[in-house]
Structure formats: C-alpha cells, structure tokens
Amino acid sequence: MYDNLKSLGITNPDDIDRYSLRQEANNDILKIYFRKDKGEFFAKSVKFKYPRQRKTIVADNSGQGYKEINEISPNLRYVIDELDKICQQEQVEVDLKRKILDDLRHLESVVSNKITEIEADLEKLTKNR
C-alpha cells in the first residue's frame, strides 16, 4: 500500500500530516509535512520537484493550429492520489468526532428539557393535593 510514496523514501506514510503543491516555472513542487513529535517546534517536511509534462494539442476544431501545454506529471498524480487518501481519511475522522460531539450536545439538551418537563408535571401533582 502507498507504493508511490514508498518509492519516494517515505517509510511511514501514516506519519504524514498534510501536503502542499505549487507550480514554479516548468516544475511542480510537492512538499509533504509530517506530524510533529512532542517537544518539536517545527514539523519535519520533505520537498520533491517534478518537471511538468509538455503536450502538443490541436488549438482549434479546424485542425489548423497546434499549441503546447504543460500538465502535471503522471507520477506526481499517483503520489497526490495516495496523499489525498491519507489526508482525507484524517478529515473523515475529525468530522466523525465533531458529529459525535454535536449529537452528544443535542442529546444533553433533549434530556435536560425532558427533566424540566417531568419536574414541572411533578410540581403540578404536588400542588393539586
């Protein structure tokens, strides 16, 4: 699993925290950040440079002109797919935690309102006697 990341020398993909991608001239710069250990001020990171792939395509539908375009390297695309799986998995876990906390707060509110309602009913019963 995560063969493309391992081919970059990343032995523990689960330690990845996030990544950034930017274009610089004819290169894409990928920077991968790892989780900080306790006591560290800065997260460890590694940087990779990928040359952009050049393609010549038809410029218009008549087939008369061509233009050259640059696009992301296929290898980089595979690496990004793996990084997205890792980073989105963490986001799903955070979202689930937030959902559970929201559900808990809602349950707390419902129970509190029900207790208030029952206490009011009890108060009515004791006043009627």
Curated annotation (Swiss-Prot):
This protein's species is Pectobacterium carotovorum subsp. carotovorum (strain PC1)
Family of the protein in this entry: Belongs to the UPF0325 family.
What HAMAP family does this protein's entry cite?
UPF0325
For this entry, the protein name equals: UPF0325 protein PC1_0937
